[in-house]
A protein has these predicted regions:
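Stable alpha-helical structural segments in soluble proteins, enriched in small hydrophobic residues
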Residues: 43-50, 68-71, 237, 241, ...
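Short glycine-rich phosphate-binding loop at a beta-alpha junction
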Residues: 45-60, 246-255, 342
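Flexible beta->alpha loop and helix N-cap segments adjacent to enzyme active/binding sites
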Residues: 5-37, 65-194, 258-259, 263-506
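Phosphate/ATP-binding catalytic cores across multiple sugar-kinase/actin-like superfamilies
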Residues: 224-250
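N-terminal phosphate-binding loop and adjacent alpha-helix
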Residues: 30-53
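Active-site cores of enzymes that catalyze phosphoryl transfer or operate on phosphate-rich substrates
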Residues: 180-229
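Secondary-structure capping and boundary motifs in well-ordered enzyme cores
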Residues: 218-219, 226, 230, 254, ...
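Short, hydrophobic/aromatic-rich segments at coil-to-beta transitions
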Residues: 1-3
Length: 506
């Protein structure tokens, strides 16, 4: 059975599911180059031949349950507790006697219980309401939260994810720049109290925060305080849910879980017998996959499980380029000679992380490497860069915190060596992808050769795009990035071809 699904929120996507597994996943922003954009007509042209006929259904928006379903079906667990934390989900009706007629809130935190094939139950939910809905409660002497039912709490305070969004817009960033705020937290020198009154209602900007955080240092200090407050809240939510249900299989989804610092903090504080799966495509770009998978299991009743193997789900790209024939060893030597090399393979990664199919690579040993790559991409100089390390060497170079692996770059880990300064953030940490040969054989072979030459089994890895643009989807996108920057080469390992930039020449 084939199922095609689409999500037209921000981060719009289309997904084609064949027999329960993702066949194609197209992210609108990669097609129209509008960051976090909604669906566009061009997105659908990739699916025309797959859906010549069939039944079209519009399913009511149940935003958080689609997040939860996505993480559950990718986890491989038979049953699980699914925790969803994001900016905001769908609208929920709230009415008298507590609220005005016609009032609505939005889901911000949800906890579901999932079991195969498609049995699910809402266990807990937090709903954010606009300030003006709360007149009745405010008249009773203050408002911070109300348990309308045992499993639902209504509040006027933003979710942890939207706190980041609101802080970003209040200091002049885009709402989706939470990653920058997380990077700034490491430069903090002082503690600043996070006042929840600054996060009341739906408005994505706080005038009070704008006034309070006028300098870069104040913004860094606040970022750290916000990071600490949010990760503590999420950790407590997960621990309480485990305690109340007794379930120790935990799936995490929603855009908040792109916060690698928080993920590591939560991991360190969970009991060792708890099994955790973080959905790598946990933002709204994964909604169409969650919808399709939930619908497939509802229609088929299948109990077959498909644990996630990788997220290279983009449209297969034809690679017809002219260049120099090379081996992985040749390219590894260029990396060792401190050339900046893009790597492009047929199918792009789903989600925001570049995992070796749409990456810019560099020698992590260069003490000026971070500044060089940030300048090349047009990024702020305070932002860290990630690394990909061969799985079998990871524990020698990073404090793995008892993690078996980190294949989707969802954890921030302490760097154990001074030999790789280019990947070290100011706090001596790095966002890490551990790589097995079975996950991406061409990428693995390149790093293996780099290790053979240098004795360092890892490379600096950042996404194949420049600041303000989206990650390259097509060969044309990648060539534009190559020739519009100070990159040296673009490597197509499936073809064994290396293309020099117009500046580098042959």
């Amino acid at each position: 059975m084939n199922i095609k699904s689409a999500s037209n929120h921000h981060d719009g996507t289309c997904c084609l599911l064949k027999n329960g597994q993702v066949d194609k996943h197209v992210i609108a922003e990669r097609v129209n180059h509008i960051k976090h954009g909604k669906l566009c007509p061009e997105t659908f042209r990739y699916f025309d031949e797959d859906m010549s006929d069939g039944v079209v259904s519009k399913i009511e928006d149940c935003h958080h349950i689609f997040h939860a379903a996505h993480s559950f079906y990718d986890s491989g667990f038979k049953y699980a507790l699914c925790v969803v934390v994001d900016g905001m989900g769908c609208d929920l009706h709230l009415g008298p006697p507590i609220f005005h007629e016609g009032s609505a809130g939005r889901e911000s935190i949800s906890v579901f219980l999932f079991q195969y094939p498609c049995k699910n139950k809402l266990f807990y939910r937090e709903v954010v309401v606009p300030f003006e809905c709360n007149v009745h409660i405010l008249d009773r002497g203050g408002y911070r939260g109300l348990n309308i039912k045992n499993n639902m709490r209504v509040t006027s305070t933003c979710s942890p994810a939207q706190m980041f969004e609101k802080t970003c817009t209040s200091i002049g960033m885009n709402w989706y720049d939470a990653g920058k705020l997380m990077a700034m937290a490491s430069y903090a020198k002082n503690d600043i109290e996070v006042n929840e009154n600054d996060f009341v209602g739906f408005d994505l900007r706080s005038i009070e925060l704008t006034k309070k955080l006028s300098s870069f240092q104040e913004q860094c200090d606040y970022a750290r305080s916000l990071q600490i407050k949010s990760q503590e809240r999420v950790k407590d939510l997960i621990l309480k849910s485990i305690e109340d249900t007794g379930i120790k299989n935990v799936c995490l989804a929603g855009g908040y879980f792109l916060n690698c610092v928080s993920n590591t903090y939560v991991h360190k504080h969970l009991p060792r017998d708890v099994n955790v799966f973080i959905e790598p495509v946990c933002g709204d770009d994964g909604i169409s996959i969650g919808l399709a998978k939930l619908r497939w299991y509802e229609l088929t009743g299948s109990r077959r499980r498909f644990p996630l193997k990788n997220i290279y789900n983009g449209i297969p790209q034809e690679i017809n380029v002219e260049g120099k024939r090379v081996s992985p060893k040749d390219v590894a030597q260029l990396l060792a000679d401190r050339k900046v090399i893009g790597i492009f393979q047929s199918r792009s990664e789903s989600g925001p992380r570049a995992l070796g199919n749409r990456s810019i690579l560099y020698d992590p040993r260069d003490p000026n490497g971070r500044d060089k790559i940030n300048k090349l991409k047009g990024r702020e100089d305070y932002r860290p860069l990630a690394a990909t390390v061969l799985h079998e060497h990871a524990h020698k170079w990073f404090d793995m915190c008892n993690l078996k692996e980190s294949p989707y770059m969802l954890y921030t880990l302490d760097v154990l060596s001074d030999e790789v300064p280019a990947i070290c953030h100011v706090d001596k940490t790095c966002r890490v992808q551990t790589l097995k040969k079975s996950f991406n054989k061409h990428y693995y072979k390149l790093i293996w050769e780099f290790n053979h030459i240098t004795g360092v089994p890892l490379v600096l890895n950042t996404s194949l795009n420049l600041a303000g643009d989206t990650i390259a989807e097509t060969v044309e996108d990648a060539m534009k990035t190559l020739n519009g920057s100070e990159m040296d080469y673009l490597y197509f390992p499936e073809k064994g071809i290396l293309v020099a930039s117009s500046q580098t020449g042959t």
